Amino acid sequence: MHFASGIIRPPFEAGCAFLQVTSGCSHNRCAFCTYYKDARFAVSPMEEVEADLDELAAHPWRGYDRVWLQGADSFVLPYDRLMEIAELIHAKLPWVRSIGAFARVTNFCNKSVEQLRNLRDVGYARLTVGVETGDSALLARMHKGHDA
């Protein structure tokens, strides 16, 4: 398995299989976050993603039905790439029913409503979004890169 850093996920995702599709953070400017300050954002090559899925498929443990995409904001990936990843997951791990990931609020702005519905339909569900505040002035002070 290819992991650029340790496993980062919400506590309730502990029972998932983990698949790195990005590393680092595409924004990496939030005033309060130091976790990715020394890490450059990178997208995992599809060859690595596929090799990791092959490794998961070969493992005898099947006690999960969800895959968690590793990376600070894996949902930043373009729609076509997310669809390709979902297709590979379902082809190699047919027992998997859903896919989770961290997402920034801005990750939803570069996808149409139809694309978001399609992503939901192929299993993307319960994405974890960092919504620290609904106050635009505070978002600017925290360098979040979006407003309320």
Regions of interest found by a model, annotated:
Residues 41-51, 108-114, 146-148:
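Glycine-rich anion/phosphate-binding loops
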Residues 4-47:
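Canonical Radical SAM [4Fe-4S] cluster-binding loop centered on the CxxxCxxC motif
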Residues 57-146:
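Conserved SAM/AdoMet-binding glycine-rich loop
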